[in-house]
């Protein structure tokens, strides 16, 4: 079986497990929307331009709660499941790519709902044609966060408090993704070019892809 077919099968299994458990959209997403509502209610009445903080709140909530969504598959990984994958001859790179694709799809849906909630709660002043560039920024940000979370989950695999340790690994490394995505949306609001920020996101995603594929086998051997 080719690398691509193995990756698609890993993605299919992870999405099937998430569909049955439903943590991302039944538990994490409602809490994220409530957190966004709390932000909107906590803004002082004297602050007139509420829309200005809408995108800031969106990315803060999306990254903080999105980490938990992306880490779900890694946290659910058991030693028995790893042994089965090894016995079946699953390529570690395919596992990384497949899990990253599954997490990215979940994050795209997760961020799409948060984006709608942000527009409804904060009513930002968005220019015409904002949807396409914003969707592009969300897509690349979701892909980067998914790969980073998958890689962090592999590094923290087998350790106590795996979820907390993986979150600590992600926090400093997610900065280029947050900067690129948030500035892309801000540039849209200012009618400026978003090319440099999209290139930053693409470069970060490619670096994470290379690192994840390259480190997948050493990390698997270290976890034995």
Model-inferred region functions:
Residues 146-153, 176-188:
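Transmembrane alpha-helical segments of integral membrane proteins
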